[in-house]
């Protein structure tokens, strides 16, 4: 029983990171219809921004959360305004453009701070462990899990309970009709892209103390994030949360009997088999029709 509890808790840690990354990806696609191939690079930018703020400016992790979000959200906003805005409804062009943006961001990091690995330590006040279901669990991992849940709830409230969310849903349902009622679809798209990239950056900031920081670190997470979004239903927020849990827990248990590489491969196979049965994903409620 202790083994299963331990692996379940480990799976929740994976779930937390996947949820934040995939949530941003799902929001961007669900609203704009853009498959953002550079999404992993925003995870990387978040990690490097956290490293810079903590090691160069002396800011703590908690204090750096808002600056990390704002800096990366501003980048996402500008990219949408300057590049993505001119490519809507051109699927292959947006895929190629966002892939190119990702490559450029990686090279900019290599040129500015180098390719060597960077490391961050877990804040001392979160480095201790606490007892949970009879297991010793890192306070930092518990914090990440609670923060991910808070971000998901915040995103849901914004989309379904605010005036901006009403405009967002109107634009995704029928852009032309929404424009007739005075909704600025361009502003909605820009804000959505900024919010989605900002969330991805926060995931990178939180994963930085757990893993090494490198220019290509985002590649390791974007594949899993795409699996989460597709499995849950490409345009379903609830599906994104549920599939994050499913993939996180499945990866944890498989890795305990083998290794991370085999676990990722088997999870991919399982995802493909599920999609053969339910091509639209496990959940069908949509942001975008």
Q: In which residue ranges do the predicted regions lie?
A:
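Pore- or pathway-lining transmembrane helices of multi-pass membrane proteins that form conduits
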Residues: 42-45, 52, 85-110, 218-230, ...
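Alpha-helical transmembrane segments within multi-pass membrane transporters and channels
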Residues: 58-102, 108, 155, 242-247, ...
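Inter-helical junctions in multi-pass inner-membrane proteins, predominant
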Residues: 2-11, 158-163, 189-229, 235, ...
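Single transmembrane alpha-helix segments in multi-pass membrane proteins
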Residues: 4-54, 82-93, 231-234
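Membrane-interfacial amphipathic/re-entrant helices at transmembrane-helix boundaries
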Residues: 1-20, 49, 61-64, 90-95, ...
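Transmembrane helix-bundle core of multi-pass membrane transporters
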Residues: 86, 90-161, 187-191, 253, ...
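Helix-loop-helix "hairpin" substructures at the membrane interface of multi-pass membrane proteins
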Residues: 14, 136-213, 237-242
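Hydrophobic alpha-helical transmembrane segments of polytopic membrane proteins
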Residues: 24, 72, 224-248, 269-275
């Amino acid at each position: 029983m202790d083994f299963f509890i331990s692996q379940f808790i480990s799976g929740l840690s994976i779930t937390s990171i996947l949820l934040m990354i995939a949530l941003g990806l799902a929001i961007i696609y669900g609203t704009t219809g853009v498959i953002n191939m550079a999404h992993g690079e925003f995870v990387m930018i978040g990690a490097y921004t956290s490293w810079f703020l903590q090691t160069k400016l002396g800011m703590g992790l908690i204090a750096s959360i808002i600056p990390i979000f704002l800096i990366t959200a501003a980048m996402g906003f500008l990219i949408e305004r300057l590049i993505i805005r001119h490519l809507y409804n051109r699927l292959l062009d947006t895929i190629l453009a966002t892939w190119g943006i990702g490559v450029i961001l990686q090279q900019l990091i290599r040129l500015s701070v180098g390719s060597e690995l960077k490391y961050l330590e877990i804040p001392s006040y979160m480095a201790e462990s606490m007892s949970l279901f009879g297991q010793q669990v890192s306070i930092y991992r518990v914090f990440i899990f609670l923060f991910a849940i808070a971000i998901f709830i915040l995103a849901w409230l914004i989309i379904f309970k605010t005036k901006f969310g009403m405009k967002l849903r109107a634009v995704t349902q029928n852009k032309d009709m929404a424009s007739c009622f005075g909704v600025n679809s361009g502003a909605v798209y820009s804000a959505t892209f900024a919010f989605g990239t900002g969330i991805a950056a926060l995931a990178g900031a939180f994963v930085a103390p757990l893993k090494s920081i490198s220019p290509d670190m985002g590649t390791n997470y974007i594949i899993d994030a795409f699996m989460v979004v597709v499995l849950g239903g490409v345009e379903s927020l609830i599906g994104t949360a549920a599939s994050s849990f499913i993939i996180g827990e499945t990866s944890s248990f498989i890795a305990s009997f083998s290794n991370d590489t085999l676990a990722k491969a088997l999870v991919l196979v399982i995802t493909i088999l599920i999609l053969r049965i339910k091509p639209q994903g496990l959940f069908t409620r949509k942001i975008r029709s």
